[in-house]
Amino acid sequence: MTPTLLSAFWTYTLITAMTPGPNNILALNSATSHGFRQSTRVLAGMSLGFLIVMLLCAGISFSLAVIDPAAVHLLSWAGAAYIVWLAWKIATSPTKEDGLQAKPISFWASFALQFVNVKIILYGVTALSTFVLPQTQALSWVVGVSVLLAMIGTFGNVCWALAGHLFQRLFRQYGRQLNIVLALLLVYCAVRIFY
């Protein structure tokens, strides 16, 4: 990979990993509501699911020419529906202001999110088909970069969770407002899938 291409790869992956998306918003919300330590299940579920999705993207990237557009479209709708459901759950979840302690989302719920998270699917397919496959079609490289993509995504999730933890007091004071803003950001993510 040339230095220019490598620079473009890092720019793309870091910007994509650090910008708002379902995982980062969920990580922020979980750490704000329950603290970083209590959010490790959420982060672990995201990380494992992310890795599996990146490996699946590696397989998909090998056969982009034969992907059925209807299947991709169906996946987009499923992802948007799940993201809107997640937004509703966040917007209506109890906060410390309400005097209630909401239960943190489970490992399996955050794991399942990855399989309908269109942002990370597009992230994986785009990175692999743009930066890796034109350079090499060696399976070891494609799998290795898929693992790297999952690690970069996990880094972004942890950064957002740490922000939620560090600003926990402020976010808890304005918990209802934060939940509504996060829910609206998720709805925006769902809409952006189609536009």
Question: Model-predicted segments: where are they?
Answer:
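Selective transmembrane alpha-helices of multi-pass membrane proteins
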Residues: 66-95, 156, 160, 170-195
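Hydrophobic alpha-helical transmembrane segments in multi-pass integral membrane proteins
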Residues: 54-58, 116-126, 185-195
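Short alpha-helical transmembrane interface motifs in multi-pass membrane proteins
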Residues: 7-12, 81-84, 108-109, 148-149
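Transmembrane alpha-helical segments of integral membrane proteins
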Residues: 55-56, 153-167
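Juxtamembrane transmembrane-helix termini in multi-pass membrane transport proteins
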Residues: 2-70, 126-145
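Flexible cytoplasmic inter-helical loops of multi-pass small-molecule transporters
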Residues: 92-106
